[in-house]
Structure formats: structure tokens, C-alpha cells
């Protein structure tokens, strides 16, 4: 907006300096301003809110992944057409890949709705109770479950002699993509996290863990990481759908103006919440069965094809 206003002022200044006929100059200035008002009104009336998952939706190639050129071009065109584009991810902001942070998204719904950011300003953040955060480690140990705490600035890992293979992969990925933030551990005196993921094996007591923590958390069963079970643990009341609602209310929009894009089971809350729901061609079967449109896989220009299908670019 600041750039647009500066551009208008520059055009007006140029017009005044070049045109000696003051009446003609004023008429030209009014035309410039009217064109601007019409353009912004058109964009505002036709603006849509686009929400994208990250892994498997915007990022291809596994971990750490990359954003295909066709996707970058499509996102830029969507913004140029006046649409707002948002990340809506299970990842907290501290675990966002650099490829995502480098792109000028208009906002973020992070950590399954635990934080909502718009134009660089945090609109909402769920603060976990301090005593609850520090009580979790003993419950996890009792239930023989391994976990990663995910925060806005850092992720926290257990100190264990035999970490599950996916935990090691997550730790290595975090180390590669978050060079400015050191790896932290559960015994850190300050635990600043919003949600966490858990992994289980045949020795884990998942039912007991659910029973001990269900008062405070919801559980999202994710795809199996054979031979491990994998769940996201999110504060009650937080979800990707709830993050969308917060943005919609803040902007005075409606769910009818929203389009959501995902591929995984943790996207189901938003995919079933919004009419215009798009599954990537590489999505899991449960996701494919719960969306209004299926596009091609991310590596085959899935985002660009979907945006074209809906007339967004």
C-alpha cells in the first residue's frame, strides 16, 4: 500500500511539472486518482484468500525441499491479481523452511492455528501454561513416547540414547534450515513452544498418553512412519480451520472467498471447513476423498493448474 501511494504521488508530481495548463493538469490528476480508486475497488471486491499447506503442497522433493518455479510464478501472479496468499501449516514459525520465509506471503497460520500473522503483525498467539509445558516430559517418559516441541523461535529435542529414526531426521532438517537458532532440549529452563509431535513404537503406551493429556490437547493422527506411529499434539481449540476463521473475521471477509490447498491428513480440518478445497494429486487417499477439486501433483505444476482452474490467475 505504501508503495502504491508513493507511485500515485510521483505520477501526480510529474503531471504538474510537465503540464503548464493548470485546469488540464487537475483533470489529468483526477483521472489518475480515479483509475487508482477503481483498480483498488475492483481488486478488493474480487479479492480471494488463498491458504497453502507447505510440505507436499508448496514444497516438492522431500526435506528440505524446494518450491517449483511454476508455483513461484503462480503465487506472484495471484498476488498481482489482488489476492492474499497465506501459509497454513502444522509447522510453527520457528520450523518454517527458508524457501518459505524468503517468499513474500501476506500472512501465516502457524502450528495448526496456534499463531496467526498478517502483514508481519501477530494477530493471535496461544500461550501454553508454563506448568503444563514442564509436566509433559515425565508423561512422555512414562508412556515411552518420543517427541519434538515446536516453538515460534526454536524446537526442543529429547536427550535420549536411542532416538527414533524420524526424530533424528527432524533434528537434522531443523539444523539445516534454521541456522540462526541453536538446537534446544527438554531440560532447557525456558520452554517456549506452541505444539509438539510424538512418535511411538510397539513399546509405547499411546492410550495412556491420550488419557493423561486429553484435557489440554487434541491429537491429529498422521501418516504412519513405519514402524512408528506419528501424531501432532495441538492445544484444544486450535486448528488450521480456526486460523482461517481468525483471518476471515479480521479482514471482514467470508469463507466463500477462501481457497485452501493441502495434501495430508493434518490439512483435513481446513479442507473440510472451506467449500473451495483443493487436494494435490500426490495427496493421501483420505484427503482426496474430502475435497472439492483434485489438481496435479506439486511437481507437475499442481498449484499453477489449480489457480488457473478457479480463475485466480
Model regions and ranges:
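Short, Lys/Arg-enriched N-terminal segments with co-localized hydrophobic residues
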Residues: 33-44
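Asp-based phosphoryl-transfer active-site loop
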Residues: 48-61
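Active-site phosphate-binding/coordination module
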Residues: 67-165
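Conserved acidic, metal-coordinating active-site core of Asp-based
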Residues: 145, 150-261, 265, 270-273, ...
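Asp-based, Mg2+/Mn2+-dependent phosphohydrolase catalytic module
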Residues: 273, 281-313
